[in-house]
């Protein structure tokens, strides 16, 4: 028989949000409750819309698209907990906006892996809403080939076909 005597946490560990994080959570909850919540998501789904562009503009104005972007690139420079607070409230309301793909997938990848040139170019555009980011995910079962991956690029947008592109 094996016995373990592990002390995982000390008695002084506080896992609560800070006062600032609680304030952010309350403000986000009020914001998403006011902006329509589930009824707004249903409207977008029922009308086959791409998303709620007005809601996305308001999220941009609040600066939440730059919540994790360093201040040097025009973001708020906050941490992952603040990002999670916003993401949790956004998910609770089923807000039909490209927050997950653009803010915590694409933007995080640029922050972590982008060159200084790419960061300087893209991060301010992601914060301001001038750009929305996502990426095409490579699948083991369906590798990208000329037959299942097409793309065209204009000065305004990228258009194409690819399996598994978030948002």
Predicted regions and their residues:
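Fold-independent oxyanion-binding glycine-rich loops
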Residues: 27, 35, 89-90, 103, ...
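Amphipathic, small/basic residue-rich leader segments at the start of a protein or domain
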Residues: 2-100, 121, 125
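N-terminal glycine-rich flavin-associated loop
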Residues: 95-117
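Glycine-rich, Trp-frequent "lid" loop and neighboring beta-strands that shape
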Residues: 75-76, 117-167
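Short, solvent-exposed polar/charged micro-motifs at secondary-structure junctions
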Residues: 51-53, 107, 111, 143-148
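Conserved beta-strand segments that form the floor/walls of ligand-binding pockets within enzyme
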Residues: 16, 68, 105, 136, ...
């Amino acid at each position: 028989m094996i016995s373990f005597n592990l002390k995982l946490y000390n008695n002084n560990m506080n896992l609560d949000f800070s006062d600032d994080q609680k304030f952010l959570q309350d403000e986000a909850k009020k914001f998403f409750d006011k902006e329509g919540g589930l009824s707004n998501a249903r409207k977008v789904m029922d009308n086959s819309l791409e998303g709620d562009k007005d809601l996305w503009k308001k999220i941009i104005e609040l600066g939440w698209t730059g919540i994790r972007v360093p201040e040097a690139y025009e973001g708020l420079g906050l941490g992952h907990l603040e990002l999670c607070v916003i993401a949790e409230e956004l998910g609770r309301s089923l807000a039909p906006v490209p927050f997950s793909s653009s803010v915590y997938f694409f933007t995080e990848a640029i922050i972590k892996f982008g060159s200084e040139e790419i960061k300087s170019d893209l991060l301010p555009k992601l914060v301001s809403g001038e750009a929305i980011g996502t990426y095409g995910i490579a699948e083991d079962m369906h590798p990208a080939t000329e037959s299942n991956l097409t793309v065209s690029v204009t000065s305004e947008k990228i258009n194409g076909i690819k399996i598994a592109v978030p948002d």
